[in-house]
């Protein structure tokens, strides 16, 4: 056992290529609340992320039960987009419970966030009886929507 305790989850972070576009999706489409948007001191960020010349703008958005950090790097040059698949080591995604998965898919499509396939019925696990779909945005960020089973 460690000599420290994890007190809570602070946030999940995604690096994005266009902070305005990502904020429009998370706030205007998904209904997140913008908590803060601001640049960070480049010297500080360079020390934190160990990338010489790093320069970023950060936004925090809040949904019920979870906060996201969205980071747009303005420097250094030569940045690239990750193209990982769910089967690749290091792949990450975030999952949100929704009350209507079809409406979530339609709203996401209107913002260019597309499903990887049709929603699927869950026949096992903690969400058995619900429905699930993976979506992907223009930056390759995967967002999973889960419609929990109806309460009887």
Regions found by a protein language model. Name each.
Residues 82-87, 106:
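Long, charged/polar, surface-exposed segments that mediate recognition or autoinhibition
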Residues 2-5, 14, 37, 96-152:
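Vicinal oxygen chelate
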